[in-house]
Amino acid sequence: MIRAIVFDLDNTLVDFMRMKDDAVRAAIEGMIDAGLNLPRETVRARIDAIYQERGLEFQQVFDVLLEREFGQVDPRILASGIIAYRRARASALTLYPHTQLALHELVRRGIRLGVVSDAPRMQVWLRLCELSLQHTFDAVVTFDDTRERKPGAAPFREVLSRLGVPATEALMVGDWAERDVVGGRSLGMKTAFARYGDTFETQESGADFDIDDIFELVGIADRINGATGSAAPPVGAPARPPAPAR
């Protein structure tokens, strides 16, 4: 039986990499317009290198860029980059197709929903609120809640505790096999690999299910729970049964 489904956030519910790319591109244009005298390709390479060092959630990337290049931070250039980044992020932060409908159908079936993310607490909640999902999930666990990243057991144990369900009655859904799938399976959760969000060209996910559309989770839950009268897949969603993991 499946009583709860736990989601990774980035590249599982939201297309994080597209959002990040659009926002960084906009920030570069904003800084150049404000007087940054560097080629776009050079600026992008420098920014990518800083993210590689500090992580994609690092919030002072433009400060570090300017300090390294010029030995000081020009507030006009910095502010222009930040504003352009925020505006582009807000417009580019979107859910994957059929996510709202899938979440609605799962809640309608009485399935509890959770989120486990390696991102900082405030960044997770900002994304959820921007997407109007702040009231959707029964439990949200971020890096700041356990100080341990997936596939470590602590974040999975924490979300299961908050949801009030045993691991054997929960399904973990994520795009990163080595973190989401491995971490969930290690505790005895069923697992689904969000192939639609995979950025690593994963061949063998090791998950119980591979899904190409998030709405497939509704069929998985119905099948495991023996439900009848399942909701029809939305237009554009795969009509076939969920694929076994490859």
What is each model feature region?
Residues 1-5, 17-18, 68, 100, ...:
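Asp-based, Mg2+/Mn2+-dependent phosphohydrolase catalytic module
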Residues 2-104, 108, 122:
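N-terminal helical cap/lid subdomain that shapes the substrate entry/recognition surface
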